[in-house]
Amino acid sequence: GYSGFDAMLLAHEIHKATNRFARVMTHHLWFVNPATAIPARKLGFEEATTENGLTLLKKNNLIILFPEGEHGNFKPSAKAYRLQEFKRGFVRMALTTQAPIIPTVIIGAEETHINLRQLKFAKYLIGGVLPLPLNVLPLPAKWKIRFFEPIYLPYKPSAANDSELVHEIAQDIQERIQNAITQELSKRDAIFF
């Protein structure tokens, strides 16, 4: 969701399970001025670039990223749980560093903060798409976070340069996650407490 609650709760769950802090790859607008950049770094946020991700992974850090990018995070709530096309950077990072990809599904974040639409014109003003939220305070949605088995890509680091392969891997992972989301939604009995 647009608020970042999903990333923070996911980081918390990872810390509980592993006793390690995961770095959260976030929208570049967090880092445009010190008023937001300083708290963002203290929260464990890093600007979502392939270079930053590679640096963190090479230092054996855990990272959290949402492959849809801003178009997924800021999509209107009318498109809830319909994944937008995955960007390819996460696959390239995994191949280059030989790090596993751990698919994760979060149910509940889409209802916690309602987004009316994307403000696409903001891209021309500030360099990024922004949401138009209905609520600032979170709604009491029930959440479920489900981790799946790690995916170890059976290719050499040089495969990161094969655009066709990278695209196929990203599509395959997106389909798996979309199917898992659909399955989890079918089990849900109520949205709110």
Report the location of each language-model feature.
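Non-catalytic C-terminal accessory region of glycerolipid acyltransferases
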Residues: 55-193
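Catalytic core of membrane glycerolipid acyltransferases/transacylases, capturing the structured
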Residues: 1-53, 70-83
